[in-house]
């Protein structure tokens, strides 16, 4: 999936969703929810994608097991970021979600990450494991994991 028109054609029975590298960077795409895709088991977002997004909602998905976000996705550069907006990532009520991986600089300006009621979560990996690399995830946020 890479074009805005692809979003309209996602089958409700989809189990694996892949957004490629450098995709869905249209200025009109400010909010995205995967909640209508009730059978989704895995979400993969490539590098440098969803660059204008302000809200990403991954909620109430009873089959979701894994979320992977590449580098510099859901990232606005200094010139395009809206400093008056709230940037929100919601991972909530996904009862079998086991793993979340987020690449370097992704969600840098997202100031409201919410990870809630993820009872099967075993692994959260953010940024680089190399201590010399600035990860920059949720740079201005207070991060909390509840439930």
Each model region followed by its residue ranges:
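Low-complexity, repetitive regions of proteins mediating host interaction that are extracellular
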Residues: 1-8, 23, 73, 82-83, ...
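LRR N-terminal entry segment and analogous cap-like coil->beta motifs
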Residues: 2-53, 61
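Low-complexity, intrinsically disordered short peptide segments enriched in small/polar/basic residues
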Residues: 7, 16, 93, 97-102, ...
